[in-house]
Structure formats: C-alpha cells, structure tokens
Amino acid sequence: MARLLLVCLGGALGSGARYLTSAWALRAFGPDFPRGTLLVNVSGSFLLAGIMTASLQSEAFPPDLRLFLAAGVMGGFTTYSSFNYETLALLEQGRLAAAAGYLLATVLGCLAAAVAATLLVRWLAG
C-alpha cells in the first residue's frame, strides 16, 4: 500500500508539472502547434532516462525513490495519449507536414534526450 501511495503522490506532482509546463508553452508560443506536449515528452524522456540510469548505477539509490520518481512523477508528467490525439488533430486539420514534423520531433527528440541523459549520468558517475 505504501508503494501505491508513492506512485499516486508522484503522479499528482508530475501531472501538476505537466499542466504548468503546457500552460506556459501555450502562453509563450500560442495554440498553433502542440509545443507544450512536445516539451513535456522530450524533457520527460531525458529526466526518466537520467533517473533510471542513476538508479541502476548506484546501490545508494533507494528502490522506493525510483518508484516515486519514475512511475509516479515521470508517469504523471509525460503524456503519450495527448501526443497521439494532437497528431490526429493536425492530420484532421489537413496539416500533414505539421503532423509529420510533430511525430518525428517527438519520437526522435525523446530518443535523443534519453540517450543524452544516459550518457550524461554515466559520465558523471565516472
């Protein structure tokens, strides 16, 4: 039960952070392209890869902290379902190039962010 509460609390924090990040991006860039979700998913991929790499490299990283951060906070922060819906919305608006760009930017950006975080954490760990 304690682990479930850790995930739920982390999820609440991550969801709040996603809302604030997306709201900021909407104010900063406008509604013409889903920059907020792209920012959330790419930065979330970076953070999740960093968390997982650090937790697997160090015995001092408590499993409950990994659960709270990875499944909870990052699970609440990132949003695959919004990414899919927004891609579909762009397609339905006839914005094929924007949909393709969003799809590629998300998939490649998230992968690049995960690789960068993994390499950074390994480098910092020595």
Swiss-Prot record:
Single GO MF annotation: fluoride channel activity
| Cellular compartments annotated | Cell inner membrane
Record-linked InterPro entries:
FluC (IPR003691)
Question: What is the recorded membrane topology of this protein?
Answer: Multi-pass membrane protein
Which catalytic reaction applies to this protein?
Answer: fluoride(in) = fluoride(out)
Reply yes or no: does the keyword Magnesium apply: no
Name of the protein in question: Fluoride-specific ion channel FluC
Q: Please give the organism.
A: Anaeromyxobacter dehalogenans (strain 2CP-C)
